[in-house]
């Protein structure tokens, strides 16, 4: 009982102290709020409440909220310094929706709103500055070196630009992997180069320098063009030679010669007694026989014993009598024709005399038929492996009495 009696006056005193504190501070809030309305702008929708209605209608709520309202400015200034104004203002507005709470928050919001706007502006400016700085750093990291490389390439191209009228592009300096751009020549330059190539396939350096100055080209470009043009000329010549050759071979190739059957081609001379070109023969060839042959005669390897030879002057032909194992005719191939004295004759049997040209022994014969189409047997074939080379591509030639026809011209020599 004593505890109850002693404890009863304490809440009354606390209530009186809170009321007096409220009425003492109400003037402060009233002057802070209503006496100086021009110091803080609230907008056109700001409502002012009379003090009497607050005192009569909401005494207890105002007393209960008063200490928090008194502490609010200091607390919120600390929050402003810590950049936490937005969260505290939103919490206070959500937790105390009453009119008195709005009134007590009114003096606290005015200093906070400009500071909050300032902080938001500062945050925006900082974010914009940070974004601008990040963009600038990104620009510095990516774009400037590319722009510098382009400027450098432009400067290099401008410094290395050739004179007017030249359509050649220099080597691009963008990277080591870039290839040299193909040089484009104008029609006038090509005409001059082709004209010069027609007269001189190889240019000396003074002429090359002169043409470089004349055509606005470099000396190196002219040199490379002439190298390429010479290679093209060689290819064209080879293609023409293959097309014009009858056998499809290149003209610089001659029929193959093998073994002891080496053929001596006679030179195309008008006289009969002139010396003919004899191919190198084996060691068994007799030296005394070299000058005994007329025009277009084949030299044949002989054996150790030489038969007697009969030499005819002028347009007459000599008769050869040889043994069966020496000569072009092989006993196994008796049907192969042999070219002797400008004519094709069929080989005789191995036991009898060979190369006996019967229809040429008389000078009074009207004409001699050189055509070989009727004298070639069916079993004869041409090829590089044929040990008895014969020539069937000769056209028909005719000779009269006392005059000898020249040997057929060989175009591939």
UniProtKB/Swiss-Prot annotation:
PANTHER family: HOMEOBOX PROTEIN HOX-D3 (PTHR45664:SF5), PROTEIN ZERKNUELLT 1-RELATED (PTHR45664). The lineage of its organism: Eukaryota, Metazoa, Chordata, Craniata, Vertebrata. One of its GO terms (biological process) is embryonic skeletal system morphogenesis. Belongs to the Antp homeobox family. This is Homeobox protein Hox-D3. The gene is hoxd3. It comes from the Eukaryota. Residues 37-53, 87-107, 114-141 have a biased composition (Low complexity). Sequence-specific transcription factor which is part of a developmental regulatory system that provides cells with specific positional identities on the anterior-posterior axis. Residues 178-237 bind DNA. It is found in: Nucleus. GO terms for cellular component: nucleus. Keywords: Developmental protein, DNA-binding, Homeobox, Nucleus, Transcription, Transcription regulation. Gene3D superfamilies: Homeodomain-like (1.10.10.60). The keyword DNA-binding applies. InterPro entries: DUF4074, HD, HD_metazoa, Homeobox_Antennapedia_CS, Homeobox_CS, Homeodomain-like_sf. Its main location: nucleus. SUPFAM superfamilies: Homeodomain-like. Signal peptide: none annotated. Pfam families: DUF4074, Homeodomain. A motif (Antp-type hexapeptide) lies at residues 142-147. Residues 36-181, 236-265, 381-413 are annotated as: Disordered. Residues 54-64, 392-403 have a biased composition (Polar residues). The keyword Nucleus applies. One of its GO terms (molecular function) is DNA-binding transcription factor activity, RNA polymerase II-specific.
């Amino acid at each position: 009982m004593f505890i109850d009696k002693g404890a009863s006056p304490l809440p009354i005193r606390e209530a009186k102290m809170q009321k007096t504190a409220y009425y003492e501070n109400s003037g402060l809030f009233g002057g802070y709020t209503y006496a100086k309305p021009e110091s803080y702008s609230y907008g056109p929708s700001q409502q002012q409440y009379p003090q009497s209605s607050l005192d009569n209608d909401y005494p207890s709520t105002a007393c209960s909220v008063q200490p928090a309202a008194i502490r609010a400015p200091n607390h919120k200034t600390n929050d402003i310094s810590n950049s936490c104004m937005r969260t505290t203002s939103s919490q206070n507005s959500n937790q105390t929706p009453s009119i008195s709470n709005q009134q007590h928050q009114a003096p606290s919001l005015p200093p906070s709103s400009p500071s909050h706007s300032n902080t938001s502006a500062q945050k925006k400016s900082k974010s914009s500055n940070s974004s601008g700085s990040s963009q600038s750093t990104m620009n510095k990291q990516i774009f400037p070196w590319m722009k510098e490389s382009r400027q450098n390439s432009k400067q290099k191209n401008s410094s290395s630009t050739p004179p007017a009228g030249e359509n050649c592009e220099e080597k691009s300096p963008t990277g080591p992997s870039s290839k040299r751009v193909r040089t484009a020549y104008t029609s006038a330059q090509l005409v001059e180069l082709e004209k010069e190539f027609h007269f001189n396939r190889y240019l000396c350096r003074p002429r090359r320098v002169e043409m470089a100055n004349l055509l606005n080209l470099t000396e190196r470009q002219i040199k490379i063009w002439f190298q390429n043009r010479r290679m093209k000329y060689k290819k064209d010549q080879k293609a023409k030679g293959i097309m014009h050759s009858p056998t499809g071979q290149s003209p610089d190739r001659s029929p193959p010669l093998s073994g002891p059957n080496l053929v001596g081609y006679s030179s195309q001379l008008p006289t009969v007694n002139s010396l003919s070109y004899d191919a190198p023969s084996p060691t068994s060839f007799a030296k005394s026989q070299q000058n005994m042959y007329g025009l277009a005669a084949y030299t044949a390897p002989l054996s150790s014993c030489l038969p007697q030879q009969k030499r005819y002057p002028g347009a007459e032909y000599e008769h050869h009598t040889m043994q069966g194992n020496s000569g072009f005719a092989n006993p196994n191939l008796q049907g192969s024709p042999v070219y002797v004295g400008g004519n094709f004759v069929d080989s005789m049997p191995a036991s009898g005399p060979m190369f006996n040209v019967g229809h040429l022994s008389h000078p009074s014969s009207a004409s001699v038929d050189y055509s070989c189409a009727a004298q070639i047997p069916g079993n004869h074939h041409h090829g590089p492996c044929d040990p008895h080379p014969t020539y069937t591509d000769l056209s028909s030639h005719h000779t009269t009495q006392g005059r000898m026809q020249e040997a057929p011209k060989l175009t591939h020599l």
